[in-house]
Regions:
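Membrane-proximal intracellular helices of multi-pass ion channels
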Residues: 1-446
Length: 446
């Protein structure tokens, strides 16, 4: 076999680079967290716990087996925050940023990998878009930290500076990690700031901006408020995001938070409608919410954010395409439509495939944990939705799980972040699709 063909066969596809890149960063993070300097007690943390924490950070989830604020030292927290930033931006984007800073030329293969990593439509302009992402990310995170600085410095003194920076990056990257400590062995998250408009509004804005996707930012910045000039995908993302914030917020407002004053009740309803779509912060006790509200939160966790964003989940566009396809079927139209444009049939197939994959992971993981740990299925469904949607919300069972159940959640977080289709494309890289067509036959549906 010629040497050139051997090199071509050995070359990794962009999808393989993405999944291996995430795995490599997770492993490195887990090893760093095992160092005695990473903990406040100065001991060595078991590998399964550091692997869980590193996976949760890189996959911007927020589920933890040890409290981030009290268990990990300043060094350990810095490692976790670095992993969150890398996971939020994407391993490939971070690697490309170092290449840009060093002045090296970006090859066509690297540009193609960057395109796949941020779900860009084409290779052209990808370097400009990467620069835009990096500048926008650090500017927004800086503004978020400055907005929260007064509240945290008031409560924590100079340590409030680190608190503001940590929570700004964690919120923008939709990670949900906090360093506010524990109360009665529970993780209160931001419940201590439920009445603080400054903290609530800042965190909500960071979550939404981080979750709508880098391409949508670019579209909005280029076309300003001229909605009619946005790409169809940007329009779909913005409208779907708005609906997924307002409708659940109305439901939560009427079902929960009766004891709160009107202003705090509205604030709590809005926050709890935004955070399940992959952020992981909470300003109320989640276990005290009604069963209906918890069910809605599970759906929101599975849906997640938008393509090419810091968020995970099935993505808002997947939901929108499935709903539009159902509407087209009811109206006897041949294809789904958005804003006067048809949706490609391949997109509908992809959306259906993603839905089936997430449901299989969601129910399969919950069933295993429920049987193995002898826990109620409802609590396990909440936890697995949080893991596969890379959310980080919990009803409190994650720290109690044994190693096999932790491995299940680690797998779900990883698959939820890199994306099931990325793994499929990586496995099928280099394989040619067959051109043969089998005879067609009708099958009755419904």
């Amino acid at each position: 076999m010629p040497e050139e063909n051997i090199r071509r066969k050995r070359r990794l596809s962009s999808f393989q680079i993405i999944i291996l890149g995430f795995a490599g960063v997770i492993l490195l993070g887990a090893l760093l967290l095992m160092l005695p300097i990473s903990t406040t007690a100065g001991g060595v943390t078991p590998f399964n716990e550091t692997l869980f924490t590193a996976t949760s950070a890189v996959c911007v989830t927020g589920l933890v087996v040890q409290d981030t604020g009290s268990y990990w030292s300043a060094f350990g927290q810095a490692v976790i925050l670095t992993l969150i930033q890398i996971g939020g931006l994407g391993v490939v984007t971070v690697a490309a940023s170092f290449a840009l800073l060093s002045g090296r030329k970006i090859s066509l293969m690297q540009r193609s990998t960057m395109k796949d990593a941020i779900s860009a439509p084409k290779v052209g302009g990808i370097v400009r878009l990467t620069r835009f992402i990096l500048r926008g990310t650090f500017l927004i995170e800086l503004l978020g930290a400055l907005a929260m600085l007064p509240a945290f410095c008031r409560d924590y003194g100079w340590r409030g500076v680190w608190m503001a920076v940590f929570h700004s990056i964690s919120a923008f990257c939709n990670a949900g990690f906090d360093i506010l400590g524990t109360e009665n062995n529970l993780y209160p998250s931001l419940t201590g700031y439920a009445g603080s408009p400054g903290i609530n509004i800042t965190i909500m804005l960071l979550i939404v901006i981080g979750g709508i996707g880098f391409l949508t930012w670019d579209d909005v910045c280029e076309n300003k408020w001229r909605f009619h000039r946005y790409r169809m995908q940007s329009k779909v993302i913005l409208v779907t995001t708005f609906a997924l914030i307002v409708l659940p917020a109305l439901l939560f407002f009427f079902l929960d938070f009766d004891a709160l004053p009107l202003g705090e009740r509205i604030q709590a309803a809005l926050f709890q409608s935004i955070t399940p779509r992959t952020a992981g912060f909470n300003t109320v006790t989640l276990s005290a919410m009604s069963g209906a509200s918890q069910g809605v939160m599970i759906l929101l966790m599975l849906i997640g954010g938008s393509p090419g964003s810091t968020a995970g989940g099935m993505k808002t566009t997947t939901l929108a395409v499935l709903v539009a396809n159902a509407a087209a079927t009811f109206r006897r139209r041949e294809s789904a439509q958005f804003f006067g444009r048809r949706v490609d049939c391949g997109a509908v197939k992809t959306a259906a495939t993603i839905l089936m994959m997430y449901l299989a992971l969601f129910f399969g993981g919950a069933a295993f944990i429920s049987v193995y740990e002898n826990l109620p299925l409802s609590a396990c469904l909440y936890e697995t939705a949080s893991a596969v949607g890379t959310v980080g919300l919990t009803l409190g069972i994650t720290p109690q799980l044994r190693i096999p159940s932790q491995m299940v959640l680690i797998t779900l977080m990883y698959l939820g972040r890199v994306g099931g289709l990325t793994l499929i494309y990586a496995a099928l890289s280099g394989k040619k699709a067959t051109g043969a067509k089998l005879p067609q036959e009708q099958i009755t549906i419904g």
